[in-house]
């Protein structure tokens, strides 16, 4: 069955990830493009669309097209909830870019709309589809590491602040590196541990390097006056079964321990980490061992105009679930928990107190 797709938001993540991936799937036609900058929509349509692809400035007009099966939401975070709910109510299946939403309440509205309409909803956590992630998930699912009681979610950059668009705008995005890249690392860690029941969260956020002049940023200097979100954030997460997760995220941090969209796991039978390729370690025959797993591991940067493998695998899995009426690989219920924890870290950082879950 051919799938007709509409794209809402034709910026960097659409052109770098969603569109090149969808364009490689034989059963997909990208038939509609929407952006408040109509020229961006026209350019995307010319590059990736069908011959008769339509362009819009108003996403509500796109949603009126009853021939569209699937909509991808590739807009700033503050728009995710309303656009997703409206798309679901317009009888479309929806892939929404990460994070699911700015707040737990918004994410819950999205989940409720999916259940109410019977349409499929997934969130763009493409790092689950990397080769190393898939391998490690098989390891944890088999129980090779035993009971995983400690995890670290890594999302640290030294100087890689996205200083374009609305990334530095608190009102539009809901936060900085925690909600931008910390969300990927936390999603991976929860997925590997298969644990979605937080009990308590404590967090800290910092506005330190963001308020200083800088010339070493990967994308050029930022303006401290425009930097309204945190430059780094850290969380301590206690799960209901006693397991503990430490989440570290930064766009700018004076640290050489730089890793992004990675996790480390410690279990009763062994441990694993993604910090130097993929390593599995433990104790055997009275000795300690470390196994280096050789895999083709690609990067996570979608701003160089190239499609990496995990983006294509994510798109294929998503389209397949729509065609075959199977659950999405990234379930909205899981993404909701990620949003709950991120929101709790921000709240704890603001109040100085722990946040407890029922």
Q: What spans do the regions from the language model cover?
A:
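Beta-strand-loop-alpha-helix segment that lines the small-molecule cofactor/substrate pocket
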Residues: 2, 69-128, 143
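Active-site loop of classical SDR/Rossmann-like NAD(P)-dependent oxidoreductases
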Residues: 13, 304-316
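Predominantly a Rossmann-like dinucleotide-binding segment in NAD(P)-dependent oxidoreductases
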Residues: 13, 127-227, 352
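Short active-site oxyanion
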Residues: 28-32, 52, 69-71, 176
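Contiguous beta-strand/loop segments that form the cofactor/metal-binding neighborhood of enzyme cores
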Residues: 187-283, 315-327
